Amino acid sequence: MKVLLVTGVLGLLLLIKWKSQSTSTSNQTCQCPTSPWVIYAFYNSLSLVLLLCHLIPEIKPIHTSYNTHDSSKQQHISINTGNGK
């Protein structure tokens, strides 16, 4: 999972670098946006988004379990996660 996170961040950085290069050289006629490393960067940033969407439901109950001020809210959350699985 850490490998996906690292490659996703690298892909996002490559995509940002490509975007900044394409805006600085906008007077050229052929920018060739389908070079292999741009496709690789797009794929890695997409995998990062999918990884984060997969991890967000797992992180949410951890944050809500530390909320000890409202016990009825805690019971409501635990019932919802129990029925959801």
From Swiss-Prot:
Which BP terms from GO are recorded? transport of virus in host, cell to cell
Outcome of mutating residue 29 to V, per the record?
In strain: Infectious clone UK
**Membrane topology per record:** Multi-pass membrane protein
**GO cellular component annotations of the record:** host cell endoplasmic reticulum membrane; membrane
Where it sits in the cell: the answer is: Host endoplasmic reticulum membrane
What does this protein's UniProt record list under function?
Cell-to-cell movement function.
> Keywords of this protein's UniProt record, alphabetized?
Host endoplasmic reticulum, Host membrane, Membrane, Transmembrane, Transmembrane helix, Transport, Viral movement protein
Name the family: Belongs to the carmovirus double gene block protein 2 family.
Q: Which residues lie on this side of the membrane: Cytoplasmic?
A: 24-36
Question: What's the impact of mutating residue 6 to A?
Answer: In strain: Infectious clone UK
- What is the official name of this protein in its record? Double gene block protein 2
Q: Which residue ranges are assigned to the Lumenal compartment in the record's topology?
A: 1-2, 57-85
Source taxon at top rank = Viruses
What species was this sequence derived from?
Turnip crinkle virus (TCV)
What residues form the membrane-spanning segments?
A: 3-23, 37-56
